[in-house]
Amino acid sequence: MARKKIALVGSGNIGGTLAHLIGLKELGDVVMFDIAEGIPQGKGLDILESTPVEGVDCRYSGANDYSAIAGADVVIVTAGVPRKPGMSRDDLVGINLKVMAAVGEGIKKNCPGAFVICITNPLDVMVWALQHYSGVPANMIVGMAGVLDSARFRTFLCEEFNVSVEDVTAFVLGGHGDTMVPLVRYSTVAGIPLPDLVKMGWTTQEKLDQIVQRTRDGGAEIVNLLKTGSAYYAPAASGVAMAEAFLKDKKRVLPVATLVKGGTYGQPDDVFVGVPVVIGEGGVERIVEIELNAAEQAEFNKSADAVRGLVKVAKGLMG
């Protein structure tokens, strides 16, 4: 069986963590790309030298030329400028749009058949731009947002209930930003919905509301603590989970930023936004359209409209 090739475009904190995690899971050989000379080569060599200790057989290489990603099965894009304290994800549109143009051309030329996972912020509009520039089919490109946001939601719920992370399921829909929609009604502990846990006296609605808001602010909380950058361990773990679902045809149900066609989820037109999907060897194999109540639908529409607003800004910058 041919070895899988995973290309990481961007060799910063997330890129380096991705490379390490991919090796530990032996998902395939890794090529790290970056425009900064020496960085992908150095990180690649460092991680390669850890493989005898870990007992994993993965090959690592670093490059500054897009030709190195030729034939990749999966491309994970983290290239771009991260947030600093006081910035919103949306402040990065103009800078990172130019990065997506270059990355998209690199993918189109060298690995148009790859499954593409975008992690660059502002997430939803960057996925739209990357698909526009790369020409990758909509089912083969996704944004990493909901997996991370749901993981943060689950983390805070685990802390509140003092239970195992394995027993908490949570869904976050919508754009990756302040308008994201953590769905309390569809989130459970061992199959018990959160509203029932309130009735059982495990928590209060007020505490759940605080957890929902902390989830929305999860990225900013870490940015403000780090002061010099943004989160990378949890985003990398989330990206690897998505890549693994594709490479192993796991048919996992994961919330990702994907192309939601007009008419789906009550949307008037097409928009890249976070919804649950099934990821397998065909990429996004289907969208899971869960039933939303009026309040949830209104929140989701608000989130999707925020993404549309950013896409409009991006189109203006593209001329």
Curated annotation (Swiss-Prot):
Transmembrane segments: none annotated. CDD domains: LDH-like_MDH. It catalyses: (S)-malate + NAD(+) = oxaloacetate + NADH + H(+). Keywords: NAD, Oxidoreductase, Tricarboxylic acid cycle. Belongs to the LDH/MDH superfamily. MDH type 3 family. HAMAP family: Malate_dehydrog_3 (MF_00487). Substrate binds at R83, R89, N121, R152. NAD(+) binds at G10, S11, G12, N13, I14, G15, D34, N96, I119, T120, N121. The active site is at H176. Gene3D superfamilies: Lactate dehydrogenase/glycoside hydrolase, family 4, C-terminal (3.90.110.10), NAD(P)-binding Rossmann-like Domain (3.40.50.720). The keyword NAD applies. It comes from Paramagnetospirillum magneticum (strain ATCC 700264 / AMB-1) (Magnetospirillum magneticum). One of its GO terms (molecular function) is L-lactate dehydrogenase activity. Its EC number is 1.1.1.37. Catalyzes the reversible oxidation of malate to oxaloacetate. This is Malate dehydrogenase. The keyword Cell membrane does not apply. It is an enzyme of class 1 (oxidoreductase). GO terms for biological process: lactate metabolic process; tricarboxylic acid cycle. Pfam families: Ldh_1_C (PF02866), Ldh_1_N (PF00056). InterPro entries: L-lactate/malate_DH (IPR001557), Lactate/malate_DH_C (IPR022383), Lactate/malate_DH_N (IPR001236), Lactate_DH/Glyco_Ohase_4_C (IPR015955), Malate_DH_type3 (IPR011275), NAD(P)-bd_dom_sf (IPR036291).
